[in-house]
Each structure stands twice: as structure tokens, then as C-alpha cells.
């Protein structure tokens, strides 16, 4: 464990998560310190941390994932909702989750 973290997320897991979103919405990633920030339509909706899919705990996500546990992506971060392996395997659920979350998410701020 380095600085209280496990090993970085694998590209294999990132590729699997992206494949589950493929064709539903435009989902992209940006690598940051061994992990992946997830964007949909230019908005950050979650990330891949230690090979876990975590999403922002907006009202729509809490409603659609009522049993999801809040977990920290890394030390000092705000808690996010953990999406289980079974939920990741359900492409329809992921598409509905993003459709519901996007209106609640702020646009990414442009750097000056």
C-alpha cells in the first residue's frame, strides 16, 4: 500500500467498464495518479479507484442504487457510491443511471 492506497486501477478493468457503457452514452476517462476519472457529456460522474466503480452520490444515484455503500475513492476525498460487479454487468442499468444523474451534475469548469 502506498500512501494509504492499494495498487492503481488496471487498464483491463477500465476497458471492461467502458465496454459496459459503449453505445449508451459518450463516456470517456482521464487517467490521474493511477486511477481514472469518468466523464459523460463533459461532466464528471464518477471514477475508477482501486478497480472499483464509484459514482457521485447525487439524489438520482442514491435512488437507483439504494443499497450502495458510500466509500472513499482515496484518503481525504468525498465519499462516493460503490457500483457492484452485478450492477456493472447490467448495461441497461448503467445507461439509466447516467441518464438520471446527468441533469444533477455540474458542467466541468474550464481552466483559465
What do these predicted ranges mean?
Residues 1-112:
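Charge-dense, helix-prone N-terminal extensions
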Amino acid at each position: 500500500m502506498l500512501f494509504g492506497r492499494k495498487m492503481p486501477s488496471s487498464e483491463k478493468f477500465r476497458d471492461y467498464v467502458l465496454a459496459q457503457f459503449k453505445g449508451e452514452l459518450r463516456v470517456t476517462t482521464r487517467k490521474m495518479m493511477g486511477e481514472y476519472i469518468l466523464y459523460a457529456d463533459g461532466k464528471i460522474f464518477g471514477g475508477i479507484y482501486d478497480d472499483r466503480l464509484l459514482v457521485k452520490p447525487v439524489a438520482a444515484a442514491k435512488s437507483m442504487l439504494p443499497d450502495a455503500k458510500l466509500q472513499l475513492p482515496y484518503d481525504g476525498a468525498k465519499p462516493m457510491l460503490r457500483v457492484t460487479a452485478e450492477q456493472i454487468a447490467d448495461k441497461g442499468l448503467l445507461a439509466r443511471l447516467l441518464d438520471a444523474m446527468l441533469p444533477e451534475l455540474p458542467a466541468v469548469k474550464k481552466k483559465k
